[in-house]
Amino acid sequence: MAQQTFTGRKRVRKFFGHIKEVAEMPNLIEVQKASYDQFLMVDEPQGGRLDEGLQAVFRSVFPISDFSGTSMLEFVRYEFEQPKYDVDECRQRGMTFAAPLKVTLRLIVFDIDEETGAKSVKDIKEQDVYMGDIPLMTMNGTFIVNGTERVIVSQMHRSPGVFFDHDKGKTHSSGKLLFAARVIPYRGSWLDIEFDAKDIVYARIDRRRKIPVTSLMFALGLDGEAILSTFYKKILYKRTKEGWRVPFDANRFRGYSTINDLIDADTGKVVLEAGKKLTVRAARQLQEKGLKALRLSDEELVGNYLAEDLVNPKTGEIHAEAGEEITDKNMKALNEQGYKELPLLDIDHVNVGAYIRNTLSADKNMTREDALFDIYRVMRPGEPPTLDSAQAMFQSLFFDAERYDLSAVGRVKMNMRLDLDAPDTQRTLRKEDILSVIKTLVDLRDGKGEIDDIDHLGNRRVRSVGELMENQYRIGLLRMERAIKERMSSVDIDTVMPQDLINAKPAAAAVREFFGSSQLSQFMDQTNPLSEITHKRRLSALGPGGLTRERAGFEVRDVHPTHYGRICPIETPEGPNIGLINSLATFARVNKYGFVETPYRKVKDGRVTDEVVYLSAMEEGRYTVAQANVPLDPKGRFTEDLVVCRHAGEVLPVTPDKVDYMDVSPKQLVSVAAALIPFLENDDANRALMGSNMQRQAVPLVRAEAPFVGTGMEGVVARDSGAAIAARRSGVIDQIDATRVVIRATEDLDPTKSGVDIYRLMKYQRSNQSTCINQRPLVKVGDIVKKGDIIADGPSTDLGELALGRNVLVAFMPWNGYNFEDSILLSERIVKEDVFTSIHIEEFEVMARDTKLGPEEITRDIPNVSEEALKNLDEAGIVYIGAEVRAGDILVGKITPKGESPMTPEEKLLRAIFGEKASDVRDTSLRVPPGVQGTIVEVRVFNRHGVDKDERALAIEREEIERLAKDRDDEQAILDRNVYNRLAELLEGRQGIAGPKGFKKDTKITRAVLEEYPKSQWWLFASPNDKLMAEIEAMRKQYDESKKGLEQRFLDKVEKLQRGDELPPGVMKMVKVFVAVKRKIQPGDKMAGRHGNKGVVSKIVPIEDMPFLEDGTHADIVLNPLGVPSRMNVGQILETHLGWACAGLGKRIGQTVDAYLSKQDIKPLKETLKKVYGEDETIKSLNDNELIELGHNLSRGVPIATPVFDGAKEADIEEMLKLAGLDASGQSTVYDGRTGDPFDRKVTVGYIYMLKLHHLVDDKIHARSIGPYSLVTQQPLGGKAQFGGQRFGEMEVWALEAYGAAYTLQEMLTVKSDDVAGRTKVYEAIVRGDDTFEAGIPESFNVLVKEMRSLGLNVDLHNSKMGPAPTSEAAE
């Protein structure tokens, strides 16, 4: 383990893995970034871009010609301009982070000679055209769309190509297998070829009505004879005196049943008696003995088929047609005609079936024209076909590159499956391809070859962001193409420019629609860094062009042998999507064809090399692959005689010389989340699945703590997710505060680049899931960092390692029934010391619109509100930062004008007496919703252009400008320092031939001389050395440019700040308020370990009542031991033991650190560390101060890494426990905190890593009295989000009926629900102090009546005493 990083020296993980890792793990979000980069190709390389991505889209749609061919619009190139706003600005303003796309188009106008029709170029015009904005990907592989971060999930779909399958005997009652072939293009019509129960072969185009496959072949230009000669061999039967002489072929005659004796035509001997069957072996033996030909009689020819038309050459009369069956009758006729030889088809019904011949005879169509008409009628029913239209339509189905595209993948797959050798630029079908497919299908029916497995990863491919976007953009451009063609025909083409022909709206709309509402464009799961990474590595089989949940069967969802090392067998959701949404394995990557590849080490002559090769599922099938944990000697040879290997989905032992490849790492078969579970190999798969899913729901805690028992993957996840900040260049820390780190770069000091890196840290930002994103620096001024070192921790990271939860002391024992059924008992210490406290940031926004009655206003002056309620608002009516607010408090004061409402007589009287005009505005302030209380951490004010900014907006703007100016000044200062130091180095000790005012010519320039003048005048010094002067001049030029660039960037940003914001139409002003809510853990919150052991906190017990150990330490958490055996997740127990050892060792190291602090003796610390870590390179390289810091960091517990499938064994755990001076059983005597008595048996105690999940009781608990009602039924809404009520459902009604509580029931169903008039009456009655009221007609009854009337049934209510009752209309 190379732990020589900055953070790696502060905390060293003891590593238990034995297998060395040869391959570097690829960057975990490479899938997203590489795909989109390939699509955009922002920088145009020399010699133009390759034909892929955006370039390919433009190339495929352009050139566009008008209908008459007089003009043509060509694509030249495209380029991106700078995005208008950067990532942070887009997040804040709710914009999309995108770059404008500029396309250079060339319009060519032709002159057409009217007589000859020859074209000559009349005019060429080139112009740059704006083609909409293309969203850009952020550094972390996400997109910012309308201010929110989104991820485009990669889709798994069936690879284009040809597939052979059968119906598994389900279609026909006899259980006969009906074979079918399907050619799937990337885009275009599907072609199916299938057998029916009578063994006739049919073709279907786009799943429409089937036509005989011979019609398809007629349409391709074959005739009956050509069809037969394509599918069958021709055998010539020659007439001799004794009968017919037939060449003998063992393959053809195997399984032949004789009617008469088989006789050798040359010797006349009987080879096989009548009534017997010729076996394969017997046939082969006969051939070996030299049997050349057989003699057959006339009757044995009956039932064969003719291969050619038999025609009388003189008269042209056809005696028999190709494919005709020989019967006794026509045999006689042929004999009479005197045919000496007959060409017959090699159909024997055993090895070769007569399927195509039977199809040919069953086909009504006899000619190409008939066939084309038939296909036309199938594709376009109801339209009368003409030969031209039918031909054009058939041509466009499979042979037109505009409409049909197999894609390179499809062509490669097709060549592989059918043994063809078409180049992969041939993207349409050819006649040979279709015939090959039919041939292969017929062979399958004859029992030759295998069908395909559609769940094999060689037959499924991944479409990543770039490709999905490419398809979307192509759709947009094609929509645009139609409009362009029409416009080219309708305008005067001589005066028009490309700009006038193009309307980029359809293209931009297609992109916007894809990012905004596609099923694959998802709101990023940002609960913690792991959930971000997993979301970006997700593979979904759903989405447009994919499967649907309802249709997907069991096979698609199941784990397939080819998933090994490519798709994780563990991580997938529980529920309806199981197996349809998967995760990429740790080492997997997607190749250029979209197939998932996994790395293997090459094995040469039984020796494992360090050469790493990536193989796709198809390639892997050809090789034999050994597991990563096979024992090797130091030279890389296998130590065992038989090695267990995988080959073509089977596991089998082979000898070492037969092994081709070996796995690179044991964790290559699982995904990132599963690779974070220690002792995964000891957990049941179902629980491991829950464990990997629940880690993604862990909330970032206030104090992150890395696990004692990790797997070594923690650092990788923290780095690749972008949560922890890594240094871009090596350098020295120059300045630092809570919000930024400034590094002076020391490597590649190219004078053209800035020598300063400023890293802005995110402080208390809200994530998509309302968790808190906060980064804090890990470095001090003067620290030296290398490129890639972690300089700041983010949410859920600790010293550059992923830290989703906390290590807590656990006891596995029952406790008074409080941990029944997976409940969790917690100690009060956990709450008091904020162990599981998390911060959540809620965002509230309010808009002031322009209404018909006048503009809304954001103000502190709100009618009928006490001064007490306004105490947290500033003069602009917006809450202060730092104010503590609770439910119902005003965050932003807002008033809305209201129309004049009719006054009651009493109001009129009061108005007349007091002359006071009632205020004509109502209070529509933004208030804190119920169930929220917290602290205001940020306020943002957005104003429309041209609207005056209020005090608060100006204050925020001033603050922001100051921050930008500070950044500029710091960068400027470091730039000055670097440049002038370099300049002084160049000038010192040189002869000066010129200089600033007062400098004596020909004096030697020294540091003292330089100090006399201000630095800005140093440039005036000159020396006779021309090379030196050229260098100084270049440096000065560069310095001036850098300075100018800095100033310009600063001014641009300030201008953007002051410009005003783009708000939705009708909105004058918008205010966003962010409230930070501190959530301590409480009963009802959900917690979980990493092994799928989840539970709900049932009680928080005072510390003194918790069970305690002999040294008086109280357990933090008590779990039920019964949760382990039936769940079979024993990993949690091993983790507990190992965690116990880690803490014990940490205690010992802590004691040696204390010894150093008191006696200044570092030897005990060094010895202890050596015992724990063995000969660790990192520890040897540390100096005393670093050792003390390390010891201090380890005193809570020594962190260890036990990688998946290659971790600590039982013996290792026992050894660690002994080293820590603990009982090797891992159990301890535990005392009851309430009585002080020891429990009867020893208890398993140790440290386990627990997570607090995002299912918090505060977000779920909900109460209401009166709230909103549904519009149609007038019943109360349901659910917390709608502020709904509790449903009084059917079963609850039965309960009240059973008790005979009639009045209560009536009340529930009427006045407490949807009796509108009754509700108001009840309210009035209660106000009057009257407690009697009557129920009316529920609104839902009126809805039912209306519904019946809409069906034409008039329903009237009649009251038996009073005549017709008033329904709602009557009331109206």
From Swiss-Prot:
Disulfide bonds: none annotated. It catalyses: RNA(n) + a ribonucleoside 5'-triphosphate = RNA(n+1) + diphosphate. Transmembrane segments: none annotated. GO terms for cellular component: DNA-directed RNA polymerase complex. GO terms for biological process: DNA-templated transcription. The keyword Transcription applies. It is an enzyme of class 2 (transferase). Its EC number is 2.7.7.6. GO terms for molecular function: DNA binding; DNA-directed RNA polymerase activity; ribonucleoside binding. Keywords: DNA-directed RNA polymerase, Nucleotidyltransferase, Transcription, Transferase. Pfam families: RNA_pol_Rpb2_1, RNA_pol_Rpb2_2, RNA_pol_Rpb2_3, RNA_pol_Rpb2_45, RNA_pol_Rpb2_6, RNA_pol_Rpb2_7. The RNAP catalytic core consists of 2 alpha, 1 beta, 1 beta' and 1 omega subunit. When a sigma factor is associated with the core the holoenzyme is formed, which can initiate transcription. DNA-dependent RNA polymerase catalyzes the transcription of DNA into RNA using the four ribonucleoside triphosphates as substrates. Belongs to the RNA polymerase beta chain family. This is DNA-directed RNA polymerase subunit beta. It comes from Bradyrhizobium diazoefficiens (strain JCM 10833 / BCRC 13528 / IAM 13628 / NBRC 14792 / USDA 110). The gene is rpoB.
